[in-house]
Swiss-Prot record:
Specifically dimethylates two adjacent adenosines in the loop of a conserved hairpin near the 3'-end of 16S rRNA in the 30S particle. May play a critical role in biogenesis of 30S subunits. NCBIfam families: ksgA (TIGR00755). HAMAP family: 16SrRNA_methyltr_A (MF_00607). Disulfide bonds: none annotated. S-adenosyl-L-methionine binds at residues 23, 25, 50, 71, 95, 110. One of its GO terms (cellular component) is cytoplasm. The lineage of its organism: Archaea, Methanobacteriati, Methanobacteriota, Thermococci, Thermococcales. Belongs to the class I-like SAM-binding methyltransferase superfamily. rRNA adenine N(6)-methyltransferase family. RsmA subfamily. Pfam families: RrnaAD. This is Probable ribosomal RNA small subunit methyltransferase A. The keyword Nucleus does not apply. CDD domains: AdoMet_MTases (cd02440).
């Protein structure tokens, strides 16, 4: 697997595009473990973001019934078409953040770090069964952070409102070529049962986490404009606001939902939350 990767690199005299975050995973054991973690069968349709030189794609094609691979680099698309003859892989040229995703039930990817956040939020708006993803370690640690933790963020809250998330393996920099400046981690995401998923108003979450160390009352006053209202209107309702004196970074998804319901019931929030994983 590793020899195959480097033979392609030398054959085409490739230089990774750092703008696109190209760092190729070169440790076969990690690739094999991630494919195993995905629990694939011929019934599965897998989405891969950033197939690069196709090492992971090749393994996915052997286990899944169908694989869609979205690649932004036209050079990589051409190389993959020349080097492989996959009967069940469809390559899609485009920016994974912008293009429409095909239907899939599992995602397995070594994500380009600079699109980790938008891809994750986009994933949470789709139906899926399991995702096995490689992220920058710091990003992965934010995904699993609990309320009150130093790393707890908007990302932590939005992910945990809809999915169970587990950091299952840390990966050193030497596992990639070229060697990145940061460590990485494997994260497994599984949607929560439908009755346990919490749909939150994204504008409200953004407004709160603009001031994550402030109290809820203070954060809402500072970010009133993001909710389409003003400080005075918000201030009039603060005395009965749920969790008003809690720090934003201490809020659980359930507590943010309490705040959302209160604001909506009092006419201070009109936009409905975006649906996903329904």
């Amino acid at each position: 697997m590793r020899d195959r990767l480097f033979s392609i690199i030398y054959k085409y005299n490739l230089r990774p595009n750092r703008t696109l975050g190209q760092n190729f995973l070169i440790v076969p054991d990690i690739i094999e473990r991630n494919v195993k973690r995905a629990e694939l069968s011929e019934k599965d349709t897998v989405l891969e973001i950033g197939p690069g030189l196709g090492v992971l794609t090749d393994e996915l094609s052997k286990k899944a019934g169908k694989v869609y691979a979205i690649e932004a680099d036209s050079r990589m698309i051409e190389i993959l078409q020349r080097e492989y003859s996959w009967p069940n892989v469809e390559l899609i040229k485009g920016d994974a953040v912008k293009v429409e995703w095909p239907e899939f039930n599992k995602m397995v990817s070594n994500l380009p770090y600079q699109i980790s956040s938008p891809v994750t939020f986009k994933l949470l708006k789709h139906e899926f069964e399991r995702a096995v993803l490689i992220y920058q370690l710091e990003f992965a640690e934010r995904m699993i952070a609990k309320p009150g933790d130093r790393n707890y963020s908007r990302l932590s809250l939005m992910v945990q409102a809809k999915a169970n998330v587990e950091l299952v393996e840390r990966i050193g920099r030497g596992a990639f070529w070229p060697r990145p400046k940061v460590d990485s981690a494997v994260v497994v995401l599984e949607p929560k049962p439908e009755k346990e998923r919490i749909e939150l108003n994204e504008n409200l979450v953004k407004a709160l986490f603009q001031h994550r160390r402030s109290t809820v009352a203070s954060a809402l006053k500072k970010s009133a404009h993001m909710l389409g209202t003003d400080k005075k209107s918000i201030k009039d309702y603060l005395s009965s606001l749920p969790h008003a004196e809690k720090r934003v970074f201490q809020l659980s998804p359930e507590e943010v939902l309490d705040i959302e319901v209160y604001l909506r019931d009092n006419g201070l929030l009109s936009q409905k939350p975006e649906k996903g994983l329904n």
